[in-house]
């Protein structure tokens, strides 16, 4: 492994294709030591709250995340030390008791709606990417995901989107576009953008190994 891992930040609105872009980049490096760290894993523990209180949490606000812990763990990985990353239980709306061990890698993709919002996190990144997707596409994807994967009802997803997700996108997420080195329209289907980013990562890796 090289002396310092490459950190790539990937952000954009909920349902905008961040994960697809991240996986597309990952798939271009099958023989490299590369891994993805999701900001969603760092949603704060809410076990002290009732279930009714938990479901009212604004999950699209910076305060919902334990970004301090994420920064601390990324710094540990940068120093070549493994960390135990938390996991989040979306059905119980709180942090799970389970963690997973993340070993040091050459490249880390840090993915989430607010990973460019905190300057301390941005300062750790070598490449910052904003996935720019139409609002209509994002809401359709979010409905499909939350109903199929998180057991949500259609009404609850739409209510949350209109009352929280959409306003938080315009208040906190969209403004971080100005920090991005690369803005990708059309998400993972934009093969040119994915290839350009892949080439840049390959160049950084090559330079680090020489």
From Swiss-Prot:
Q: Reply yes or no: does the keyword Transferase apply.
A: yes
Biological pathway:
Pyrimidine metabolism; CTP biosynthesis via salvage pathway; CTP from cytidine: step 1/3; Pyrimidine metabolism; UMP biosynthesis via salvage pathway; UMP from uridine: step 1/1
Task: List the catalytic activities from the record.
Answer: uridine + ATP = UMP + ADP + H(+); cytidine + ATP = CMP + ADP + H(+)
Write out the annotated subcellular location: Cytoplasm
Main localization category: cytoplasm
Q: Give GO terms: molecular function aspect only.
A: ATP binding; cytidine kinase activity; uridine kinase activity
A GO cellular component annotated for this chain's UniProt record is: cytoplasm
- Residues involved in ATP binding: 12-19
Gene3D superfamilies noted in UniProt: P-loop containing nucleotide triphosphate hydrolases
Question: Top-level EC class, please?
Answer: transferase
Keywords from the named record: ATP-binding, Cytoplasm, Kinase, Nucleotide-binding, Transferase
PANTHER family associated with the record: URIDINE KINASE
Protein name as catalogued: Uridine kinase
Q: Which gene encodes it?
A: udk
């Amino acid at each position: 492994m090289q002396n310092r891992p490459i950190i790539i930040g990937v952000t954009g609105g909920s349902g905008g294709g961040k994960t697809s872009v991240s996986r597309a980049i990952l798939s271009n490096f099958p023989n490299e030591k590369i891994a993805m760290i999701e900001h969603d894993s760092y949603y704060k523990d809410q076990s002290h709250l009732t279930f009714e209180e938990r479901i009212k949490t604004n999950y699209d606000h910076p305060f919902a995340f334990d970004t301090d812990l994420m920064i601390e763990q990324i710094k540990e990985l940068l120093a070549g030390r493994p960390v135990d990353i938390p996991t989040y239980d979306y059905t119980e709306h709180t942090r799970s008791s389970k963690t997973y061990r993340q070993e040091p890698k050459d490249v880390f993709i840090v993915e989430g709606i607010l990973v460019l919002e905190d300057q301390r996190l941005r300062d750790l990144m070598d490449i910052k990417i904003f996935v720019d997707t139409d609002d209509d596409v994002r809401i359709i994807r979010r409905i499909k995901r939350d109903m199929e994967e998180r057991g949500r009802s259609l009404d609850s997803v739409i209510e949350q989107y209109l009352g929280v997700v959409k306003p938080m996108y315009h208040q906190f997420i969209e403004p971080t576009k100005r920090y991005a080195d690369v803005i990708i329209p059309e998400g993972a289907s934009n093969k040119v953008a994915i290839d350009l980013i892949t080439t840049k990562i390959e160049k950084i890796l090559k330079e680090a190994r020489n």
